[in-house]
Amino acid sequence: MKELDQILEKCAEEIDPLSHEIAERIRKLKNLPKDEMFLEYLRIIDFTSTTKIPWRKKNYILIILWKYGEKIERLLYSRLEHFGRANVPKRYFRLVDGKILSMLFLVFILFPAFTSHIWSFRLGYEEIQVGKEITFNENLCEYRTAWLYDFKASMVCTIKYGYGKVNIRLNSTNPMEAGVEVQRFISQIPYDYARLESGFSYIQTPRETIGRRIGVCSDFAILTAQVLLDNNVSPVYIIHTLFKGDITGGHATAALFINGTLWIFDWGSAPVTFSEYLDTIDRLWEVREVRVYRLTESSIVLDRVYKGEPESDAWRYVYTLTMLIGIFIIKRREWLWI
């Protein structure tokens, strides 16, 4: 067959510069019957793969033999596929596809949502009885900047020493009724979200809060405590809650002990028990510590502290590990080098 001889000659010509011996063996195949010639061609490939020659040269020869072997096979045996390339659908490389997006949704949405409910402040905290009085030099209270950003000093200067005091008369001295009345009053004052977002959590006196008609939680807590104490509702409690990663100073609200239950009177909400308050705030933020201050007209005492158990952040690294493993599993067939 003339076409077959041409294929063998071209193959020999390409291999000759690399190995004259192999090229001559290929030329001799022209004189053999087609079946014997094909088997001998396969033997030449096997001989080349096992011969000790430089690997780069060996690879070049094998590539040439494979290329022309495919042509010979198609010419002689259309049904054989020793050399023929498998008919595999072409895969297009896509960095992001539906599977990747689904995995990212699981890793960064569902998984964090689930794990965030595993740890809860209510499920593990330590109650520490403190009973330590909070003090601050009265002479320093005359300098507003000395306690502008200090919540504890602000309580001492405004509640104990009366700086920035307001005179508001309530309609009742009943603790619950008085607490509800003050709560409704402070809830009518707009919340200063701009100051909260800015991170500059300075403390206002009750007079400043009333005069400016705006404030944040610490301002409303101090105002509520001062008004209640001024109306002979005593003692008043201030609950200071600290959150993980919060730079604004946490959240403060006033409270009263009524019939053995601590009731919270927070801005913009109805009265709730301390337990209900913790349940609500624990769902919104990661609570790290709750400080309970006991206030009278003559003293500010850190009564007790509820301290959350330390939470390990080691499990958060599962995000990255899961993502890398997921990408490897999903994309391994497209990334041919894996």
UniProtKB/Swiss-Prot annotation:
The chain crosses the membrane at residues 100-120. GO terms for cellular component: membrane. It is a single-pass membrane protein. InterPro entries: Transglutaminase-like_domain. It holds the Pfam family DUF553. It comes from Pyrococcus furiosus (strain ATCC 43587 / DSM 3638 / JCM 8422 / Vc1). This is UPF0252 protein PF1496. Keywords: Membrane, Transmembrane, Transmembrane helix. Belongs to the UPF0252 family. Signal peptide: none annotated. It is found in: Membrane.
